[in-house]
């Protein structure tokens, strides 16, 4: 599923953030992004690694335009709130969706995060 997000007709809009829930999805997406040079406009984050300072610093270095919150980098809801006004955000797993402030739109093989009105 994950590689389909980066090849062929793009599932993710230009400049998107893709937040992955598993190593399998993350490594496949990273391979297509970094090894094959596809979709260099897309930022790929692993939700499980956001708890580590070294990972957050690496993400800040690789994607300086991405809003990474200093006070709570693991707060996915705050990460979504900071980035959704400026970039489309997708999840590889709908179970990652925090709270009720957002809904999902299927964008196979991903799920686009949509703010509720």
Q: Where would I find each of the regions flagged by the language model?
A:
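ER/secretory pathway lumenal C-terminal domains and tails of membrane proteins involved
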Residues: 1-117
